[in-house]
């Protein structure tokens, strides 16, 4: 269950980042709209620019944290909630067993042929 809560937490963080990107676009749009006017409201423009900058810094920090996490997971380092390594080891062991069976049957066939001659 810890795996699901960790995954849900990661997804929630990404959803928060997505909402923050929406806010960034909204702030940028408001600032551009204000700049297109003949007489700009400098206080509104300053507030929108400050909100834009703060949001961009927050998104950058959160995305960096997500990338660090994904890099750690992708490098094969063990971490809580990952069963990939165990599954891969099991798959490889099954393939080795199949290969051993194939070779043993080849040896048995060769022995039978030698006994017949």
From Swiss-Prot:
A GO biological-process term: positive regulation of transcription elongation by RNA polymerase II
Domain of life: Eukaryota
Residue list for modification N-acetylalanine: 2
Gene Ontology molecular-function annotations: transcription coregulator activity; ubiquitin protein ligase activity
Keywords: Acetylation, Activator, Nucleus, Transcription, Transcription regulation
Cross-referenced InterPro entries: Mediator_Med11
One GO CC term, this protein: nucleoplasm
Tissues with expression: Expressed in cochlea.
Family note: Belongs to the Mediator complex subunit 11 family.
Role noted for this protein: Component of the Mediator complex, a coactivator involved in the regulated transcription of nearly all RNA polymerase II-dependent genes. Mediator functions as a bridge to convey information from gene-specific regulatory proteins to the basal RNA polymerase II transcription machinery. Mediator is recruited to promoters by direct interactions with regulatory proteins and serves as a scaffold for the assembly of a functional pre-initiation complex with RNA polymerase II and the general transcription factors.
Protein name per its UniProtKB record: Mediator of RNA polymerase II transcription subunit 11
Taxonomy of the source species: Eukaryota, Metazoa, Chordata, Craniata, Vertebrata
């Amino acid at each position: 269950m810890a795996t699901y809560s960790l995954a849900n937490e990661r997804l929630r963080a990404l959803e928060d980042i997505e909402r923050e990107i929406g806010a960034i676009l909204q702030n940028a749009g408001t600032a551009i709209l204000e700049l297109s006017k003949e007489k700009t409201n400098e206080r509104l423009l300053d507030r929108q620019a400050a909100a834009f900058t703060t949001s961009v810094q927050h998104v950058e920090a959160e995305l960096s944290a997500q990338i660090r996490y994904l890099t750690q997971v992708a490098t094969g380092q063990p971490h809580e909630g990952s069963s990939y390594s165990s599954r891969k080891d099991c798959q490889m062991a099954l393939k080795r067993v199949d290969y051993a069976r194939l070779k043993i049957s080849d040896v048995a066939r060769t022995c039978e042929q030698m006994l017949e001659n």
